[in-house]
């Protein structure tokens, strides 16, 4: 079954790492190991780091008109910073992979199963 591992954290905390080269290198190395471990286990199907929320555009269609707003829809303490798409047998396995995510120690990781239509597309269906 396909699951999204959604990585949330405080962008301010990440921004502070930019001034600490050693800490930033350690974080990048931890994520490289995490991705390599998922790849070696054959569960990784995709993933990416997201740009900061100030680069986001929210789109709404109201009364047939497209309205765009700079930034995310809602202000929150933690922002979505990246994701992984994994294919594992069950939620327990997905949670185990999420717990290994480097950001689990100081942010939060949401595990969400993909819907039936998304899973069918991932498996080569229509």
Outline where the language-model segments fall.
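Conserved, structured core segments of small domains
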Residues: 1-126
């Amino acid at each position: 079954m396909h699951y999204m591992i959604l990585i949330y954290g405080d962008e301010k905390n990440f921004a502070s790492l930019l001034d600490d080269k050693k800490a930033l290198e350690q974080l990048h190395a931890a994520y490289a190991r995490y991705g390599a471990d998922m790849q070696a286990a054959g569960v990784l199907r995709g993933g990416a780091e997201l740009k900061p929320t100030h680069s986001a555009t929210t789109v709404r269609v109201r009364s047939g008109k497209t309205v765009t707003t700079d930034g995310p829809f809602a202000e929150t303490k933690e922002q979505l910073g990246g994701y992984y798409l994994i294919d594992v047998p069950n939620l327990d396995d997905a949670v185990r992979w999420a717990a290994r995510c480097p950001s689990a120690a100081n942010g939060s990781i949401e595990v969400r199963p993909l819907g039936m239509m998304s899973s069918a597309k991932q498996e080569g269906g229509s």
